[in-house]
Amino acid sequence: MGHIELLDAYNNVINEWKERTRMENGDVLELIDRGLVVCENTHRRGLLLNGINPSFNEKKNDKSNIFFVFSNAEDQGRSRYWAKKHKQFGGRDSDLVQNHMGYLDLFPLKESRQLRFEKILRPYNDLRMLLLKKTQEEIERIDPKLIVHANKGSLYY
């Protein structure tokens, strides 16, 4: 499953879940309506960096920006997330980052504040489980030798 198929799989899970539950919780629907984002991991990689979910910028919520490449990811505004991650592994242009490293958020839903993200998803363990199942399938496809958690939120899962 490549990044396009992964995005389709996530969308199918969400659409089936919405259809089945007919839920009307504004917070989780708002999260879903922001659009999904996945990293392009087209090759198997030795090292996989996991985050919990993509950030969200209300001013720049571009729903057409659905894919990114880890080695080219750039920070927006005051965030230094990507700069720190690249530096941890030898810099954006290092052989490790360019050729041997992938990135995958456990959830494709955009939200910058981890506590808010967890609070919104807490009542919807079924949705969380379905999304994580697709993420697990992608991790198995990438077949990393080592998984590094970008933060304690991703370590929890």
Give, region by region, the residue ranges found by the protein language model.
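Active-site and ligand/interface coordination hotspots across diverse enzymes
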Residues: 1-77, 131-138
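Glycine/proline-rich loop-helix segments at beta-alpha junctions forming the active-site rim
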Residues: 111-157
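Mobile, glycine- and charge-enriched loop segments
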Residues: 46-53, 57-127
